[in-house]
A protein has these predicted regions:
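His/Glu-rich zincin catalytic helix
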Residues: 1-82, 193-194
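Acidic/histidine-enriched segments that form metal/cofactor-coordinating
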Residues: 78-193
Length: 196
């Protein structure tokens, strides 16, 4: 790892320490005076926009919602268990979100920061799943998609995007559609995990 570089942001009175890790990931640390709670965020440049990309000059195309689906599945360990339970045992809260451009996994805790950080790095560093597990997750994501359809603010937002960017990935829900998530396979998820 390169040495930490300190940057001071006068307008918000914050110091940010940053470095590039040996694996190419960016690290940023912000020490918050007077705060007891600690948090860590791990982001990857893989979001809803990234369902068409080139590998070795060949176009790869995946169903809408693949990044969000992978976000869900990474919370499953090798035995099919929900890793959230491991964070709960440490007194930590863990979650994730997918945007158009990235997916972020994060946790916050008062104690056991190092152990929680190890868990975060472990569960985001490997992917294992079964077809049965993926099919089960499709039902969960389908419910999530339908829930957003009941939210007038979200429907207005998506309607604006659909009007501004018709027939593009921007006119689709970040989670995809009920139809698009039905197309997602274990192989699709593994291919995208390996790529990003």
């Amino acid at each position: 790892m390169a040495a930490l570089k300190k940057r001071y942001y006068q307008k918000i009175d914050e110091e940010v320490y940053s470095a590039i890790l040996d694996n190419g990931m960016s690290l940023s640390i912000i020490k918050k005076k007077g705060f007891v709670e600690k948090a860590a965020f791990l982001s990857t440049n893989f979001g809803a926009l990234d369902n068409h990309f080139y590998i070795d000059g060949e176009l790869q195309s995946y169903p809408a919602g693949i990044a969000h689906f992978l976000e869900h599945k990474l919370f499953e360990d090798e035995q099919g268990r929900d890793v959230t339970l491991d964070f709960v045992k440490l007194g930590a809260d863990v979650n994730a979100f997918t945007t158009l451009e990235k997916t972020t996994y994060y946790f916050s805790t008062l104690d056991h920061f190092e152990e929680s950080l190890e868990l975060l790095l472990k569960f985001t560093s490997s992917f294992t799943s079964s077809e049965d597990s993926v099919n089960h997750e499709k039902r969960i994501i389908e419910q999530e998609i339908n829930m957003y359809q009941d939210d007038p603010d979200y429907r207005a937002y998506l309607g604006c995007l659909q009007s501004l960017y018709p027939n593009t990935i921007l006119d689709q829900d970040i989670a995809g559609s009920v139809d698009s998530i039905e197309e997602i396979t274990v192989k699709d998820l593994k291919d995208n995990f390996d790529c990003f």
